[in-house]
Design a protein with these regions (language model features):
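Ligand-binding pockets and gating/stacking loops
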Residues: 2-373
Length: 373
């Protein structure tokens, strides 16, 4: 007599293919595998999930395996820079310069503009003890090359900006998953109560593809979403109260508000969005003095400003953001991500002028940040 819960895996030459056999065998092992994973007999009652309220917070947590790093700064420069002109030299391209490509080209979403080979017009040189080849377009990077890992084998199964960016930031091409910064703050918490645990620093010329999804908490509680620091002053809006509400007046108001919010949350302790808003409001209060101090780069030395390129109009904006990123992690912020504008490296033409311009803006400040850390 056959069991109704386990599929029939009887095989005959007339009715079973290899695919059917493997499918039936795999299905029949599911109850056994689940029982083994849960360390319980097949006859045991199902384990009830814990549906009680969970406590999510930003308290600092110890990782399963200790490491030397306590924070991360990500310089996310969206687009596809010409690797053969920057960090992946191809001498054969120069030998075949302006020749017609001898093989067939499979075009996708790019126009069939040309089938001629174009060698790089820029010189490469090996730098550091590693001997890594770097283009003359990146003099700052060449000075810190031994502190940099160059990966030349990365690829993705999609060629659209949106999916690729989401894969880089969240690990999957599908939207809706938490960004890397959200996972880090969820797993490790924060080492400061005066500043956000996760900061996104945007570009004055606009957001990258997918916009705010780049620092989204996905299905994690809103507590782990990135906090935006603007590229222009005031970098954080509405941080300081009106003059009439400052001092004791504000303290009394916030004290009463905290009490009312606490009572409201006790009656709705499963509402994670409510808990996140309450936590963020209390954080905003503490940030009034701490954020102003962290964002004030005037306290840095003249030499530091010069190192980050802040005295140069071309590198000033990105240099300021790099310096602020360093000041944030020094004060306990767990994850800081700097974004460039939409399609920053997406050069579909005029490469000989547009690629150097993109390099000039970010090369010196980015190298200074790595060197300064």
């Amino acid at each position: 007599m056959q069991s109704k819960s386990i599929p029939d895996i009887t095989c005959t030459e007339s009715n079973t293919t290899r695919r059917k056999f493997l499918s039936r065998v795999s299905l029949s092992t599911i109850p056994l595998a689940l029982a083994f994973a849960n360390e319980q007999p097949l006859s045991a009652k199902p384990v009830k999930p814990d549906l009680g309220p969970r406590n999510f917070d930003l308290a600092a947590k110890n990782p399963h395996q200790s490491g030397t790093a306590t924070a991360m700064i990500s310089m996310f420069m969206q687009g596809g820079p010409s690797q053969v002109d920057l960090m992946d030299p191809k001498p054969l391209l120069n030998k075949m310069h302006l020749q017609k490509f001898p093989e067939k080209i499979k075009y996708d979403n790019a126009a069939e503009a040309s089938s001629r080979i174009f060698g790089t017009p820029w010189k490469f040189k090996q730098y550091g003890q590693s001997g890594t080849a770097i283009s003359e377009l990146l003099p700052g990077l060449s000075e810190i090359v031994d502190d940099v890992l160059v990966i030349r084998s990365m690829h993705t199964g999609v060629n659209n900006h949106g999916q690729s960016i989401h894969a880089m930031n969240s690990g999957r091409i599908q939207e809706g998953r938490p960004a890397l910064g959200s996972w880090m703050t969820y797993a490790l918490g924060s080492e400061t109560r005066q500043l956000p645990a996760y900061v996104a620093m945007t570009d004055p010329q606009g957001l990258p593809v997918l916009g705010v999804l780049n620092w989204s908490n996905g299905w994690l509680p809103s507590l782990y979403q990135g906090t935006v620091i603007r590229p222009v002053e005031p970098r954080i809006l509405n941080l300081n109260p009106p003059t009439a509400l400052r001092g004791k007046t504000q303290e009394n108001f916030l004290s009463l508000l905290k009490q009312l919010n606490g009572q409201h949350h006790q009656r709705r302790n499963r509402e994670l969005e409510l808990a996140a808003r309450r936590t963020n409001l209390e954080l905003a209060t503490r940030m009034q003095s701490a954020a102003a101090n962290a964002l004030d780069i005037s306290k840095e030395t003249k030499a530091t400003h010069e190192m980050y390129g802040i005295n140069n109009p071309v590198t000033e904006e990105f240099g300021k953001r790099c310096l602020i990123a360093r000041r944030l992690v020094e004060r306990g912020v767990r994850f800081v991500q700097l974004f460039t504008k939409n399609q920053y490296w997406d050069h579909h033409g005029s490469l000989q002028t547009r690629l150097p311009a993109s390099c000039q803006k970010i090369d010196i400040p980015a190298a200074a940040l790595v060197n300064d850390l």
